[in-house]
Amino acid sequence: MSLFSAVEMAPRDPILGLNEAFNADTRPGKINLGVGVYYNEEGRIPLLRAVQAAEKARIEAHAPRGYLPIEGIAAYDQGVQKLLFGNESELLAAGRVVTTQAVGGTGALKLGADFLKRLLPDATVAISDPSWENHRALFEAAGFPVQNYRYYDAASNGVNRAGLLEDLNALPARSIVVLHACCHNPTGVDLELDDWKQVLDVLKAKGHVPFLDIAYQGFGNGIEEDAAAVRLFAQSGLSFFVSSSFSKSFSLYGERVGALSIVTESRDESARVLSQVKRVIRTNYSNPPTHGASVVSSVLNSPELRALWEQELGEMRDRIRDMRLAMVEQLAAHGAKRDFSFVGRQRGMFSYSGLTADQVERLKTEFGIYAVSTGRICVAALNKSNLETITKAIVQVL
């Protein structure tokens, strides 16, 4: 009998598996609204000018490619901290934030999960309903039981505020609560500042451990605005975790540039926490890759490149907003009986469209339009050339 004879075929990843199916589709007019990637008006993944300039400078400098420290590039880690907590953060001045480079936002989440398993081995993890599909898998892989807290209200196309607070309050004390800091994936429906304050009150009262995931900073209302939840928590006195990613905001998907930040109570505590996180990193991948983080670091720490990047990110954010509004208009123009105005109020790269799994399947089989079975569509994949095709098809499957 073969060593692998009992190995079962794993189910396809709901998003990356969709991409595989899309690539295998030979129809010329196919459209991919599934994977979370920003495309420009020409339907291509852009190479940002700020990134090009940073890469050019790095190539011309003939920088060596030796091993990085376990925690990554120091200037990168510091740039991440300032982006999240602000240049004048009291936490940073007090040495109360530990940041390590990570292999994408996914890697940051897994590092945090593995470290938390050592700290709180019997804790429960709570994620929003719905949430990014990999949240559950990552924390279950670390050995945690994972449950949902209510978040999205389909009737109002908004946040189920009462259900959210009730469920957070009902969790066992010292639970780990994963929260989308901005641009909620998959719904595009965010908490407002007053909501965050109420959530924070419950977390403090119950002794929960917040784990903020921020993969889309700058795609909601702006770089500073999208960090509002992180900065509110920074003022709370709580210790908490933040996973962040630059895949989207720098259009560096294949470089896997992320970071894990942990807020502690003191500089001494930070040193001890960092030593343990480094142990987790060492047993996972030893140390992180150089190129992507060096590019991001160069941009964040150069006033000229930082300004150019913020301009380019603003242009991407504006294009997504324009596509949202145009989608709402065209759906109505093509005869949709349903009110889709909520799409225009959502933030970030995604929209929870309200389409059923059967309707999504019809979009794929009849029109070659791929979306996630939950009805999540990537608004960043819309453009003026494909919008009419997409909206007409949606109206036909309603």
Swiss-Prot record:
Names of the cofactor(s): pyridoxal 5'-phosphate
EC assignment: the record states: 2.6.1.1
Q: GO molecular-function annotation terms?
A: identical protein binding; L-aspartate:2-oxoglutarate aminotransferase activity; L-tyrosine-2-oxoglutarate transaminase activity; pyridoxal phosphate binding
Subunit structure of this chain's protein: Homodimer.
Q: Where in the cell is it found?
A: Cytoplasm
Q: Per its UniProt record, what Pfam families does this chain match? A: Aminotran_1_2
Principal cellular location given in the protein's record = cytoplasm
| Signal sequence interval, chain numbering | none
- Enumerate the InterPro entries for this protein: Aminotransferase_I/II_large, Asp_trans, NHTrfase_class1_PyrdxlP-BS, PyrdxlP-dep_Trfase, PyrdxlP-dep_Trfase_major, PyrdxlP-dep_Trfase_small
* Protein's UniProt name: Aspartate aminotransferase
